[in-house]
A protein has these predicted regions:
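Juxtamembrane/disordered regions of integral membrane proteins
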Residues: 1-214
Length: 214
């Protein structure tokens, strides 16, 4: 079974990869998507990429057999709810206020759904706090980096065209977002499965001697 540190690292590494792919439609073809399907359509496409790629990279955050199907069943609904809340908050209020409101409502819904799915409602507050704080840090630090890099005339002495700078800046935002949200997911899943891990240890007291098996 994964330790707390292992869950966090799995979340960071897995979701950072997912996030780079999820930000790619905006970074590489944002204007085309805006013209073709609009802002909400672009965010929907990004959300579908996040959901579709999350399973292979993150399903081992769930302990026990059948983790891939169980992960998709839970995460697809939870991330869809999170995305809807964020999109509504952002498009209604805009700016940092819209982002904060969307992030809080979205992560609150996600954390509650995780806790309920694992029959551990007492862990909801911890899961929500982990998701909101770490997601928020990754999002806003990434936004600051995106703004800084997009305004540079050169990077490490290498001149970059504006389009290249903008693409790089957006992908760097995706990396920061992935690190923060991934860490939050690792913590949230670990918190919500505390009872399940305790039961597994009682049923298999020697399992801790094989930490690499999970």
């Amino acid at each position: 079974m994964p330790s707390l540190a292992a869950s966090v690292w799995r979340g960071i590494l897995g979701f950072t990869c997912v996030s780079i792919a999820g930000f790619a439609p905006w970074a590489l073809a944002g204007r085309w998507f805006h013209r073709t399907v609009g802002e909400a359509g672009l965010y929907t496409v990004c959300a579908l990429v996040f959901i579709g790629l999350s399973g292979p990279l993150l399903h081992r955050l769930i302990i026990g057999p059948g983790s891939l199907a169980r992960f998709y069943k839970l995460f697809s609904v939870a991330f869809a709810a999170y995305s809807v809340a964020w999109i509504i908050g952002w498009m209604s209020l805009r700016g940092h206020t819209g982002s904060l409101v969307g992030l809080f409502v979205g992560t609150a819904v996600m954390g509650w759904m995780f806790a309920r799915a694992f029959g551990a409602p007492e862990t909801a507050i911890k899961a929500i706090a982990a998701l909101f704080v770490l997601n928020g840090l990754g999002y806003f630090i990434g936004g600051w980096i995106e703004g800084s890099v997009s305004g540079l005339k050169d990077l490490f002495g290498v001149a970059l065209q504006k389009s290249a700078r903008m693409t790089l800046a957006k992908l760097l935002w995706g990396i920061c977002y992935g690190i923060g949200f991934g860490a939050g997911l690792g913590l949230a899943f670990h918190y919500c499965q505390a009872s399940a891990r305790a039961c597994c240890r009682e049923l298999s007291p020697r399992s801790d001697s094989h930490p690499g098996d999970w």
